[in-house]
Amino acid sequence: MAEKITTRSADYSQWYIDLVRSAKLADYSDVRGCMVIRPNGYAIWEKMQTALDRMFKETGHVNAYFPLFIPESFIAKEAEHIEGFAPECAVVTHGGGEELAEKLYVRPTSETIIWSSYKKWIQSYRDLPILINQWANVVRWEMRTRLFLRTTEFLWQEGHTAHATPEESQEEVVRMINVYKTFAENYMALPVIIGKKTDSEKFAGAVDTWCIEAMMQDSKALQAGTSHNLGQNFAKAFDCQFQTRDGKLDYVWATSWGVSTRLIGALIMAHSDDRGLVLPPKLATRQVVIIPILKGDKAAVCEKAHAISRTLSANGIPAFVDDSEQNSPGWKFAEYELQGIPLRIELGPRDIQNGTCIVARRDTLEKTELALDDTLSVSISEILNAIQQNLFDRALEFRNEHTFEASSYSEFREMVENGFVIAHWDGTAETEAKIKEETKATIRVLPEEPDYISRYAMHEAGTCIYSGNPAAQKAVFAKAY
């Protein structure tokens, strides 16, 4: 029988761990803080990679690969950067049986090693822009880990671009955060808010950090992607100058942006239920499972099931048949619900006789009878599209229902236990830190989306809910992963 998982209402954190392990997405490693991504989990990452890689290339980016090891002298060149990452770094001190002359850092992120190459490649405005993405692993020495959400080693992509003007680099920052939003909403069925981080939350070494923030089913926030305007900070650190069109020397303008396997954690927590994983069809490697009810003429039922599978697959709908006899249909139903297969077709002798089959949706658990004729592929495709849309609509409705507006600090403290809170903030790091200390809530995002700004009057002046000082804007606060 499919493994029993803790319910969300009983213990949300344990539910998440149970689901990840029972659905065979990932497991703990013998290396502290690291995880093993199992085939079911890696298949989701591959689907994400495929979609994102296509989107990156459509916006003019190309892939490259840079070293895993970064000399200590490179890391030290950008003071703010090293200050932000030093506590998380893994450091190699010995190699080949000898102590190294210079320590090597295992990349926590690649700005420094990449900019050491960009300095060699860029001499003139004709060499710009450089639009490079890297698919890689990174290491950040986490003390408190959770599968997919926070691990010592994780997989990601990191884009690193170089530009001739600040306007071009800012356009790149906004372009790529919008690529992430499109991916999150169209593929993950995950509504997100685009905006900026506060100075205390931005990337170490960045001028500005833009992000997409999502709400999970426990009403906590999860940062799903970031895009950083690095200004000329890294170019200055590596003395990367270029000759401008008018013959002058200037430092290059830079951006970096990335998402990671953390997105799989977001996907799980946004959509899944007490039965197991719920996957948006666009990120499901296997969209349809066909389960023959093996009574009577087993051979005829299996033959029809495989014929349906071939037809669906030929029409771009990845399908497979489970006609194994060691487990009952009921066991299979539960197992494939646990694995998050979006659609199940049940097929028995009577169904074949009637020219119909039963189709069960994973998102709503509703069952429908469909005709076994030339319209089947179209009908299945329509249901898969409906599942994709329903997951997005359901998540958006949940976010809207759990977004509150606070006009006092007492109101704020109560509301922040149940979702996002929009409240006036005086713009100071002191107030931000005090609120975090007292409530564990942080400013997740300063929204930049016109619709969101308008809906919640984000730029309306008022009084800070904590300090009572004048506030020029509102911020979105939440507890977060």
UniProtKB/Swiss-Prot annotation:
Assigned protein family: Belongs to the class-II aminoacyl-tRNA synthetase family. ProS type 3 subfamily.
Entry's localization field? Cytoplasm
The entry's keywords: Aminoacyl-tRNA synthetase, ATP-binding, Cytoplasm, Ligase, Nucleotide-binding, Protein biosynthesis
The protein's organism comes out as Chlorobium phaeobacteroides (strain DSM 266 / SMG 266 / 2430)
Among Gene3D superfamilies, the record links this protein to: Anticodon-binding domain, Bira Bifunctional Protein, Domain 2, C-terminal domain of ProRS
* CDD domains, sorted: ProRS_anticodon_zinc, ProRS_core_arch_euk
GO annotation (BP), single: prolyl-tRNA aminoacylation
Under which name does UniProt file this protein? Proline--tRNA ligase
Any single GO molecular-function term of the entry would be: proline-tRNA ligase activity
Task: Report quaternary structure and partners.
Answer: Homodimer.
